[in-house]
């Protein structure tokens, strides 16, 4: 079939070398590496294929902007989301007094969330691999003294991932280890960003051009939150899944959701899926989960059996726990009075407050332009419908007060806690979509650090007209969700070993951000890709010895 897609019946007949659940930065990269080594790989993807040539795919704009009429009904909106590579899963947030239902802006389709990401791909600091020492008051956080791998062990995999994803940018002046990354240069700063860069340097700070997995073709809009139309976004769909199926014999099952793993005491025997034609039972030597830090733990917890009464690979009772998502506050500034910036501008990184006065906070970086007002007015439900009725007024207010500035994201590391978690849902939503249940609260240590961090940012941008858009308290901000199946040395306090294999199962691996034992304060994409290459090499050497 086109683009490597395989018939469901044929997929059931084959005994695969590796079944990879999810095609994002972790699954796509690992599957590509194994396929390139000659392994028979099957990708399972819950969402639609958005590979080139698939009809109906929405590119170059968010679906709320591209198909406004379709998005005003529930059915039309969900269909448009799926065709735009967006998740239709419902999230039930039980953190407050009353449960809240919403849909996160997460990827679903070939490439997963990498197809929507802002393309920032930079290495973690060496200190991120020994995190606990940088927090004065971790309280009851489970943040470890160290990851089970070191920066030095990750170094060659970082370099390989940077090459695979075509990363361009400048080294961070505050990070000696960044200077060793031989990255091609990114384009020069835009005029608006250069004004801010000059101001920051004048304050004695150290801005740099963010490393971006982008080819910067003429007309590049650095597509964030939607699919790229001109093939300059280097995501796992373009750089890994497509070559895996087109050149290296991998196969792809889309619109196919893994619902349960069947296992004995030591091995996963079947991956049970719901597909367009019904229930499938797929078999393989190795099973790799990369469905994201919400879906992966939910899948394990929903795989309870007599052999695994608490959920698969959950002897520690840590599956689903230690949920982290980064605490991100947005600040919009206007560096030049009377000037408006509407062009793509995701360029600046600043880490002067990453490690500051003996404490760890996070990064400040360009966020890109404000989302279109249609995100508010074009959707199902009473509020979008009401806003649509007064659309000219809403648009005027939005354009006047919320648009035209440079948006900076103050992204602070949050710590892992056992009570922040993903839980099994009681069942699907009313519309038969997958429902995920989560619980997350900001702990006192994070509240204290966030207060200090945001104070520094406000002081930094004091000379400019500014608008504090906040955001850190909003549990819908899940783009960097991680930590729910952490790796570590001790099976009592981790789910996976140092090679990302489940402590209790011989053939089960997890390579999405679930494995993070701490969230660091930077974008996770490059670390996920680098680690996936590392784990793929381990699987190839140990599970398929020559």
Whereabouts are the PLM-identified features?
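Glycine-rich loop(s) and the adjacent beta-strand/alpha-helix scaffold that form part
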Residues: 36, 40-64, 247, 256, ...
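Residue-level detector of alpha-helix initiation sites
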Residues: 20, 24-25, 29, 191, ...
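FAD cofactor-binding and catalytic pocket of flavoenzymes
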Residues: 88-113, 117, 121-123, 128-131, ...
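N-terminal glycine-rich phosphate/pyrophosphate-binding loop and immediately adjacent elements
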Residues: 2-138, 143, 148, 152, ...
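Alpha-helix N-cap/helix-initiation motif
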Residues: 23, 233, 269, 312, ...
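Secondary-structure capping and boundary motifs in well-ordered enzyme cores
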Residues: 12, 26, 291-292, 315, ...
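A glycine-rich dinucleotide-binding beta-alpha-beta segment and adjacent secondary-structure elements
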Residues: 209-229, 259-267, 403-414, 419, ...
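Conserved redox-cofactor binding core of oxidoreductases
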Residues: 69, 73-87, 93, 97-103, ...
């Amino acid at each position: 079939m086109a683009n490597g897609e395989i018939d469901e019946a044929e997929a059931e007949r084959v005994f695969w070398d590796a079944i990879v659940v999810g095609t994002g930065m972790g699954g796509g990269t690992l599957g590509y590496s194994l396929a390139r080594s000659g392994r028979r790989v099957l990708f399972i993807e819950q969402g639609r294929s958005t590979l080139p040539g698939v009809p109906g795919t929405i590119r170059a704009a968010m679906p709320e902007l591209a198909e406004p009429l379709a998005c005003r009904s529930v059915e039309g909106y969900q269909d448009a989301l799926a065709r735009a590579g967006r998740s239709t899963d419902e999230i039930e947030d039980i953190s407050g007094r009353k449960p809240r239902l919403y849909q996160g802006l997460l990827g679903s389709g070939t490439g997963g969330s990498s197809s929507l990401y802002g393309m920032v791909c930079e290495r973690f600091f060496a200190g991120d691999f020994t995190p606990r020492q940088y927090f004065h008051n971790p309280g009851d956080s489970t943040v470890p003294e160290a990851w089970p791998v070191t920066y030095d062990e990750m170094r060659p995999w970082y370099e390989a991932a940077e090459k695979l994803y075509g990363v361009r940018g400048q080294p961070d002046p505050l990070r000696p280890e960044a200077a060793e990354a031989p990255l091609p240069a990114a384009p020069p700063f835009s005029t608006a960003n250069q004004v801010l860069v000059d101001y920051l340097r004048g304050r004695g700070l150290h801005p740099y051009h963010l490393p971006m997995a982008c080819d910067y073709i003429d007309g590049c809009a650095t597509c964030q939150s939607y699919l790229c139309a001109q093939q300059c976004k280097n995501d796992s769909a373009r750089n890994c899944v497509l070559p895996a199926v087109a050149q290296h014999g991998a196969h792809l099952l889309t619109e196919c959701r893994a619902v349960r793993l069947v296992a004995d005491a030591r091995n996963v025997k079947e991956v049970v899926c719901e597909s367009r034609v019904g229930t499938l039972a797929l078999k393989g030597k190795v099973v790799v989960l990369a469905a994201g830090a919400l879906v992966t733990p939910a899948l394990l917890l929903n795989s309870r059996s007599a052999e695994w009464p608490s959920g698969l690979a959950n002897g520690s009772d840590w599956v689903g726990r230690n949920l982290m998502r980064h605490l991100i506050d947005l600040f919009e500034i206007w560096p030049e009075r009377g000037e408006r910036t509407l062009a793509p501008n995701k360029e600046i990184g600043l880490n002067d407050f990453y490690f500051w006065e003996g404490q760890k906070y996070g990064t400040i970086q360009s966020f890109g332009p404000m989302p279109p007002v249609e995100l508010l007015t074009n959707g199902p439900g009473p509020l979008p419908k009401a806003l649509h009725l007064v659309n000219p007024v809403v648009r005027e207010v939005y354009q006047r007060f919320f648009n035209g500035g440079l948006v900076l994201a103050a992204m602070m590391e949050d710590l892992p806690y056992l009570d922040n978690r993903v839980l099994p849902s009681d069942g699907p939503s009313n519309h038969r979509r997958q429902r995920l249940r989560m619980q997350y609260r900001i702990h006192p240590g994070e509240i204290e650090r966030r207060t200090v961090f945001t104070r520094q940012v406000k002081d930094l941008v004091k000379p400019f007209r500014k608008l504090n858009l906040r955001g850190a308290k909003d549990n819908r901000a899940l783009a960097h969700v991680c930590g729910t199946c952490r790796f570590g040395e001790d099976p009592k306090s981790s789910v996976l070993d140092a090679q990302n294999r489940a402590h209790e199962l011989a053939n089960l691996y997890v390579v999405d951000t679930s494995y993070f034992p701490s969230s660091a304060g930077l974008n996770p994409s490059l670390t996920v890709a680098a680690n996936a290459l590392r784990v793929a090499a381990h699987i190839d050497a140990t599970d398929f010895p020559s």
